[in-house]
Amino acid sequence: LSLFDPYWIKAAGSGIFYEDVNLYKKEWDGIFGLIAITGSRNITSLEKLSPELTLIGSWAKCLIREDGDIYLLKASMDEELKDIEAEVTVSKLFGALNIPHAEYESAEYEDVFCSKTKIMTTEYMHWVSADEFIDFSGCSNQFEMGVKYGKDNFLKMIICDYVTGNIDRHHQNWAFEYDDQNEVRGLSPLFDFNFAFCGTVDRKSQFGADNTDFEVAVYVIETFHMEAFL
């Protein structure tokens, strides 16, 4: 089960139905989730919290339910909390520029400092990573794939990642949205900014062979006439 795609597995002959296990509506095991993010079994309080074990990445993550909404918590791995500061700062910047994105805020949960964002998937709108989408689309060139299935937001992502010095836009860190009819709806809102402000001028781009992030951003602006976006 996952809150990011609609697929689930049950034993053959099982009488369980999806509504019996629907994570959007069912409560979670609080202790399991707290262990996932704190690494400790010495839990003094129970909250409606779940471990997030389906996302890629080394940061400890878990899900909480607050006032009917579901939030993803990601624990900081930096003593100075620069990873949280980066996510919150980029989130505010993208908000000012009206770029679809996950909104991050700083939070503290069970004495663990975290970034916190409300999940953007629903029972009817799901995400698939670019990495997984390659097999589905039959498109081996990820730049062409991004332009084909989510052009506007994909091109903005490349420019914004250069401007914010985000060095972690690997192909499991951006995604496409698809609905409950398996129809692709475009690029998902941008997410995962904890490695922003870490870039260098000569860093090689993940979207352009031997080109740098700067060169690919310039190519996008000039080729697709994105000057108005700036």
Predicted regions and their residues:
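Short, charged phosphate-coordinating catalytic segments
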Residues: 172
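Phosphate/dinucleotide-binding and metal-coordinating scaffold of catalytic cores
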Residues: 1-166, 175-230
